[in-house]
């Protein structure tokens, strides 16, 4: 595949250029050269960042009682044994770059960007014992002026970002949230007793490497949510040129999915953006049972109708070297638990995006059709679940299409099937409900299997 070789070369060169750029930083200072106040290091760390390009945090424990604002051209190196924690009850995030902006109401145009932020090492600790919920931890500021932020660290409108060799612990919101990023490396990150997404990536991202991510989280280990709910988004837009590899989700993590959410988003001024994914490789992934590649609006009631949204697009997307044990539905809802004949399909790859070329290579999946007969390697098409209060979870009116599905070295329950079609499902809804549009379908035009 030409796109695969070109993408590998592009990301390799990006990583090298980033290393050369950050290696040129020579002005450094120890954080302990500054004085803390009553055991709080917020002011000292902020002052050090304002005055020097490289801050070294020695081994020890450091408490912050507010947010650190990182300007352009900065490196933070936390030595082994450095533990940086938020003080008990602090509701704002720990760190963000200086040029963040709300990109959910209007497209981001000509906004000043940061260039060059690098953080390496350290254990970064929140005070939470469970997921706190939006507006209760990880806020952008005390006024929650950026509504869709709930994270330990936020990086947006940044060119050249490197986060590596970091441990996150007890995060009540996302550990890392990104959007409007170009030329980023996120690698060697571990999560310990975190309660939401590990790495949460929103839109307008170009040239990103995510690798060697592991640990325990309460939601997605890594999420590429170019289209997402308002309370989880810093912006909306496409993502291109992605390598995401070597992910290991701990067995103790209860939600074993990886969301890759596309969609058509409408801004307040009526302009629209395709939150698309193009040129992406996801490989060497363990512990995930379902990859979700579709548009999902928030829960709505038929009388009100769903948010304005449409099916997003993608092209040249590869999943490779992945092991899946689909021992139960990822969403423990009645339709899936009871294998509803129309709405009960589950799959390792659940598709609801208009995709040009999708590649599945070296996939080893175990299906448990004795318990869940509507289990598949991949499915495409609409989804629908109704709560008891009448709320609709998905979008049964959306149709989607894959032009070319390329399958290579697929193993189902340990065997390589001669015929793959029994493991691929095109979902069709035909006037499923009377109260909302509910005639959607999924279609795969061509399947190439070897």
Feature names for model-found ranges:
Residues 1-450:
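Extracellular/periplasmic carbohydrate-active domains that bind, remodel
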């Amino acid at each position: 595949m030409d796109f695969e070789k070109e993408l590998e070369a592009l990301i390799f060169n990006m990583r090298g250029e980033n290393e050369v750029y950050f290696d040129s930083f020579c002005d450094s200072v120890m954080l302990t050269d500054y004085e803390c106040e009553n055991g709080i290091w917020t002011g000292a760390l902020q002052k050090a960042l304002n005055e020097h390009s490289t801050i070294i945090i020695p081994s020890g424990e450091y408490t912050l009682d507010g947010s650190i604002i990182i300007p352009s051209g900065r490196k933070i190196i936390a030595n082994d044994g450095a533990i940086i924690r938020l003080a008990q009850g602090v509701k704002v995030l720990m760190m963000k770059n200086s040029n963040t902006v709300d990109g959910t109401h209007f497209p981001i145009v000509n906004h000043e960007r940061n260039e060059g932020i690098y953080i390496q090492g350290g254990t970064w600790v929140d005070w939470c014992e469970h997921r706190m919920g939006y507006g209760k931890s990880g806020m952008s500021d005390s006024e929650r002026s950026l509504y869709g932020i709930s994270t330990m660290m936020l990086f947006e409108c940044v060119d050249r970002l490197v986060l590596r060799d970091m441990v996150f612990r007890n995060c009540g919101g996302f550990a890392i949230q990104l959007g409007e990023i170009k030329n980023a490396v996120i690698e060697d990150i571990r999560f310990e007793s975190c309660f939401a997404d590990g790495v949460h990536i929103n839109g307008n991202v170009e040239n990103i490497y995510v690798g060697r991510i592991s640990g325990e989280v309460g939601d997605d280990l890594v999420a590429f949510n170019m289209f997402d709910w308002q309370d989880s988004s810093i912006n909306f837009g496409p993502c291109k040129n992605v390598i995401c590899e070597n992910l290991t989700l701990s067995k103790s993590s209860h939600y074993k999915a990886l969301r890759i959410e596309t969609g058509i988003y409408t801004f307040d001024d009526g302009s629209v953006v395709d939150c698309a994914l193009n040129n992406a490789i996801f490989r060497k992934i363990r512990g995930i049972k379902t990859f979700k590649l579709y548009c999902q609006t928030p829960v709505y009631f038929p009388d009100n109708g769903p948010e304005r949204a449409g099916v997003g697009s993608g092209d040249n997307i590869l999943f490779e070297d992945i092991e899946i044990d689909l021992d139960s539905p990822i969403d423990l809802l009645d339709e899936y638990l009871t294998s509803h004949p129309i709405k009960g399909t589950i799959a390792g790859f659940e598709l609801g995006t208009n995709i040009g070329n999708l590649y599945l290579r070296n996939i080893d999946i175990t299906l448990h059709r004795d318990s869940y007969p509507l289990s598949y390697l991949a499915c495409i098409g609409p989804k629908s679940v109704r709560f008891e209060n009448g709320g609709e979870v998905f979008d049964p009116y959306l149709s989607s299409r894959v032009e070319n599905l390329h399958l290579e070295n697929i193993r189902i329950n340990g065997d390589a099937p001669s015929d793959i079609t029994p493991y691929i499902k095109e979902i069709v809804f035909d006037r499923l409900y009377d109260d909302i549009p509910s005639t959607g379908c999924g279609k795969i035009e061509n399947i190439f299997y070897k």
